[in-house]
Design a protein with these regions (language model features):
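Position-specific recognition of the canonical hydrophobic site in helix A of tetratricopeptide repeat
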Residues: 33, 60, 67, 94, ...
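Structural marker of alpha-solenoid helical repeat scaffolds
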Residues: 51, 85, 119, 153-154, ...
Length: 276
């Protein structure tokens, strides 16, 4: 978990005699968060903040914990405190941008992602979260450019190609966007290659669901398959103007907050925009 590694790199701002206790609290909190022990991680993070209120690491850890607990407003405030303490802390902008997105605060999310890239320009080609934020901000041309750049990073990722299509279709129309669909290698996740064919005009929605049912996947694999199928069928139907079917699939995709990670949040944000 890259975000946890960031904590170790933030400069200390505590007296020497408190350093060992603080280091232990941060280590305990990171370990608990990795293990999914949210309450234990929250306790360690709160103690770290109390022990060293001018050290950004405690707030960063607590922001991660609150984000994991789906407390995006509180998480965003913690990352904001990190930025107040260290305006050059790029990863705090990245994390806060993600929390803003979950709250459907698209403009604020995009501003933070842009600030992150101002500080870390080398990350620009692979910043797919920014591309998605651009889509929801209505900046479709910029979004298409972001995902086009991502083609060099995600050569085997159907999602990058689909999001390029979704942005590009808003600019040049569906037919031309389909003709300009980014070429990819092989995305091994089921049913992503069928999803690719769907947006390429070579498959039907029922083909995507049929792919989900193939074989005898374990429960966790089946949940993943169903999630991606419902997410991209929802986005597909929305792109064709069928809001009813889009809602049906996006409701299924966003139903379980423990499935889909950030893309689950995308499903929920999109659904919130579709609802009257």
């Amino acid at each position: 978990m890259r975000a946890l590694a960031i904590i170790a790199s933030i400069a200390l701002g505590v007296p020497v005699d408190e350093k060992d206790d603080l280091e232990q609290l941060l280590a305990n909190g990171k370990a608990a968060l990795r293990a999914g022990k949210i309450d234990e991680a929250a306790s360690a993070a709160n103690q770290a903040v109390q022990r060293a209120p001018k050290d950004a690491r405690g707030y960063f850890l607590r922001g991660l914990v609150r984000g994991a607990a789906r407390k995006s407003t509180e998480a965003g405030a913690d990352f904001g405190k990190c930025i107040e303490l260290d305006p050059k802390l790029a990863d705090a902008y990245q994390q806060r941008g993600g929390e803003y997105f979950k709250l459907a605060k698209i403009d604020e999310s995009l501003a933070d992602f842009d600030k992150f890239l101002e500080l870390r320009p080398d990350e620009r080609p692979g910043h797919w979260q920014r591309g998605i934020a651009l889509y929801y901000a209505g900046k479709y041309k910029e979004g298409a450019e972001q995902f086009k750049a991502g083609d060099k990073v995600f050569a085997d990722d159907v999602e990058n190609a689909v999001w390029h299509y979704l942005c590009n279709a808003k600019v040049v129309g569906a037919d031309k966007a389909r003709a300009e669909l980014l070429k990819i290698g092989t995305d091994k996740r089921v049913p992503m290659m069928v999803v690719y064919d769907l947006f390429a005009g070579k498959a039907k929605p029922e083909d995507v669901m049929a792919a989900v049912e193939k074989g005898k996947p374990k429960e966790s694999e089946m949940k993943s398959r169903q999630f991606y199928a419902n997410l991209y069928l929802g986005l597909y139907y929305d792109s064709t103007g069928d809001k009813k079917k889009a809602r049906e699939h996006l409701e299924k995709a966003g139903a379980d907050p423990n499935v889909g990670g950030y893309m689950g949040d995308v499903a929920r944000v999109h659904l919130s925009i579709l609802r009257p």
